[in-house]
Amino acid sequence: MQGQTQSISFDGREIRLTTGRFAPQAGGSVLVECGDTAVLVTATRSGGREGIDFLPLICDYEERLYAAGRIPGSYMRRESRPPERATLTARLIDRPMRPLFPSWLRDDLQVVATCLSLDERVPADVLAVTGASIATLLAGIPFNGPMAAVRVGLLGDDFVLNPSYREIERGDLDLVVAGTPDGVVMVEAGANQLPEQDVIEAIDFGYEAICELIKAQEQLLKDLGITQVKPEKPDEDSTVPAYLEKQCSKAISAVLSKFDQSKDERDTALETVKGEVSETIAGLKEDHAVRQALASSPKLLGNSFKALTKKLMRQQILKDGKRVDGRGLDEVRQISAMAGVLPRRVHGSGLFQRGLTQVLSTATLGTPSDAQEMDDLHPNTEKLYLHHYNFPPYSVGETRPMRSPGRREIGHGALAERAILPVLPEKDTFPYVVRVVSEVLSSNGSTSMGSVCGSTLSLMDAGVPLKAPVSGAAMGLIKEGDEVRILTDIQGIEDFLGDMDFKVAGSEKGITALQMDMKITGLSVKTVAEAVNQARPARLHILEKMLEAIDTPRDNLSPHAPRLLSFRIDPELIGTVIGPGGRTIKGITERTNTKIDIEDGGIVTIASHDGAAAEEAQKIIEGLTRKVNEGEVFSGSITRIIPIGAFVEILPGKEGMIHISQLSEARVEKVEDVVKVGDEVTVRVREIDNRGRINLTLRGVPQAGDAADVEPQPTPVAPLS
C-alpha cells in the first residue's frame, strides 16, 4: 500500500496530505491530517443521468466515535443516522463545492468525508472542506477549483486561524470562510454582537490564508503529475433559445416591469406567455428546426424560457435599478410583527411577516433535564437552547408527503439558533432550557431570517430576558462582468435567479450570525464588505418594526411555564440528597410534586408549576445538606418509634434519634410512656457518630410550656453562594 505524503506548513502547523494509499477504487482520495485529527475524503463520479436538469451532487460527512476513543451509547452500540452537527458539516462541504461544478454537468457525484481521528485542538470540518477540493481534483472531475476553507476566531483583539474547540468557546467569533482564486465562495459565522468592520476584517484575514492553501493544492497536482480538468461547456443547439428570445422577450419584460402585481399574478402571467409560445411552436411544421430540437430534448423549452426570464430580470436590475416588485435595490418589503398570538398555554409566540414570507415561532421553557444530549464527536455534549425549523409544502402552495426534517430544514434551524445564542441570558440567572419552533406558513424568500425575527418575538413574549433583540435580513447580488448590484431583502425569484444568498442577523450592537452562499465561482472581499454594510440599515429597520409589537421581555412567565428555583449545595453532599438508589430524591419529588436536577458542581434546580411546592422542596434539600453541630437545639416532631428510642425530624428531611436512656432523667421502661408519633419536642444534639448519625437528647432540655427557658431554634443556613 504505497502512497505519497506531502506536508504543508500552515500558520505554524503542519498539514499532511496522503494520496494513493486509501480507498483505491474511489475516483480520488486524500487523507488530511493536522495534529491528531485525520479526515479521509473521497470523490467519485459515475455515469450521467438522462432526463434531469440539475447536478446530482451528494456531499456526506461521517463521524465515527472511535475517532475519539468512544463506543456509541445506542442499544446497538454502533453509529446510526448522522447527528445534527455532522449534517451541518456535510452542508458546509456542499455549499462551496456545488457552484464550482459546471452547470451542464449531469453525472452523479459523491463526496464523502470520514473523520477517522479527532484532536480537540483541531476541528475536522474545515479540513474536510479543503480535502473535498483535493479529492475532486484527483478524481479528474471538471471543477472550477482549487477551493479551500479556514476557520477564523477572535480572542481579545487578535484573530486566530483554525482555533481549537476551547478557543472557539472562549472567543467572540466563529467564522468559516471558503474561497477560490476568484474570491470568496462561502461564509458561515456566529459572532458575539460584533461590529460589521470586525467581521469584514476577519473574512479578509481568512481569505489571505485560503490563498496559501490554494497554492499548496496547485503544487500537489504538479508534484503528482496531474493536470486539472477544467470545465469546457459542450456545444449546445441555440435554435430554441434564439427563437424564444425573438418571440417572448417583449412579453416577458412587460410582465417583469409590471410592478403592481402580486407574486401569483406574475407567475400566472409568465406561465401564460410560456403557454402561448408553446402553442405557437405546436403550430410549426414538424420539420421546423425548433420542433426537431424539442423532440430530442423535451425539457429544453422550459429551461430556455427560465434562462431567458433570468436574463431579462437581471438586465432590468442592472440597467434600470428596478426589481420585479418595483422596489429599489436597498428597499425592504412591508413588515408586520405580532407577539402573543397564541394562548398562554404556549409559553411564548410571535408572528413575523415580510412581504409574502410569514413565520410563526413559539417558545417553550423547560427544565435542565430537558437539555439535549449530543452523542457526537464535539466536546460540548449538551444543548440548552434549541431551534427547530419546519417548512411544510403548503407554504409554497404545493402538495407532497410530510417527512422528517431534511438537510435544508436542519441548516435553516441551526442558522436561526446561532443568531439568538449570543443574546440569551446566562444560565445562572435564567436556568431554563429553551426550545423555539419556527413554522414557515408562507415562503417567498428569506424564511431563515424570518425565523430569527419570529424567535425574538416569541422569546420576549415568553419572558426570556434577552440581552438584546435580534433581527435578520437576506441580501442578494446580480453580477455581470464588472457590473454588480447588491439587493436588500431578496424574495424567492431573486434568490432563484440571482448570484448570491447572503443572510445577516444581529442586534443594534452588531452581528450575531452570518451565512453567504454563491452561485458563481467567487466574489471579492470588497463586494462582500459592501453587502455586509448594506444589510445593517435593513436589519435595524426590521428591528424597529418588531419593537413596535413588543419592546421588552414580558415581566411574568406564562402561568403554564414551570417555575424554577436554583441554588447551590456542597458537592460532597449530593449523595446525601440523592440517597441510596435514589430513594431520598425520589421521595422529595413525590412529596412535593416537583422535578429536581442536580449538577456535578452542586447546582440544584427545582421545577414546579406551584411556587410553594418548589420552596418546600428547597427547604427539605437545605435541611438535608445543613451541617448539624453538637450542642445545637432544635424543635421537631416524632416521626417514628422503635423499641430502643424515637426519631425526630429536626430539619426538613433530616432525622436524629433519641435513645430510650435520653428520654428522661428518670428510668424509662417503654418509649411510648414518654413520647408518641406526632409529638412536638425540643431536643439537643448530644453527638454525631463516625457514621454521621445524629444522636439527640431530651434530658435537661426545657419543653414547650416553659418556652421562655427554651434555647432559640437556629435559623436555617442560606444556600451556598
From Swiss-Prot:
Keywords: Cytoplasm, Magnesium, Metal-binding, Nucleotidyltransferase, RNA-binding, Transferase
Domain S1 motif: residue ranges: 631-699
Pfam family, any one: RNase_PH
Required co-factors: Mg(2+)
Gene Ontology CC, one term: cytosol
Disulfide bonds: none
Example GO biological process: RNA processing
Residues that hold Mg(2+) according to the record: D495, D501
Stored InterPro entries: ExoRNase_PH_dom1 (IPR001247), ExoRNase_PH_dom2 (IPR015847), ExoRNase_PH_dom2_sf (IPR036345), KH_dom (IPR004087), KH_dom_type_1 (IPR004088), KH_dom_type_1_sf (IPR036612), NA-bd_OB-fold (IPR012340), PNPase (IPR012162)
EC identifiers of the protein: 2.7.7.8
Limits of the KH domain: 562-621
Homology family: Belongs to the polyribonucleotide nucleotidyltransferase family.
Its job: Involved in mRNA degradation. Catalyzes the phosphorolysis of single-stranded polyribonucleotides processively in the 3'- to 5'-direction.
Protein name as catalogued: Polyribonucleotide nucleotidyltransferase
Origin organism lineage: Bacteria, Bacillati, Cyanobacteriota, Cyanophyceae, Synechococcales
Gene that this sequence comes from: pnp
